[in-house]
Amino acid sequence: MGERFWSIEFSAGTVLILSFAALFVGALMYWIRGGIRGGAPPTHVYFVWERSFIIAAVVLTALGLALLEALLQNSAGGVLARVGAIAYLFGGVLVVAAEASSLNQGLHKNSSEQNWAPATIYVVLALLAQAAIGGSLLQAGLLPPWIGWATVVWNIGWLLAYLIKRGDIYIPFVHHVMPLVIGIALVTHAT
């Protein structure tokens, strides 16, 4: 277990998988309370836990992408990996700040009063960042090419859909699917 367990490839994959697990818990809490239909959380503590899992998912994704960048830094995909990791980090800082400020404002009683511009910037940065990560995976040849292509197509496709769609574009699930796929592939490849 020793050397493979502590490899950067295994570590990056594990952190990316954990990011999806954190998102899943937060999204499940949101779904249980009927958040999609505008349902309020039962308590403020419940709301804090729900949003904290979403925040944790963003932080873990940023860490996982940074580890992936370190793995790819000396490959043909090194530049795109670095651009992707840094862009996601910048976007992540913005959405964590937006989520954290929502904790202080209460239970989203009037979400129109909340400043979600940082979350919108996060959405664009996260999609572009992960498209760059997909390109870096294609250039590096570390994982099967379909993973790189799927990452590029998924993220550019959502970006184009958001350009057409009006209204709320902050759907955290969108930004954690491909990191999960990449994470599983990295862990499988490392073992």
Predicted regions and their residues:
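Hydrophobic, aromatic-enriched alpha-helical segments typical of multi-pass transmembrane helices
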Residues: 1-191
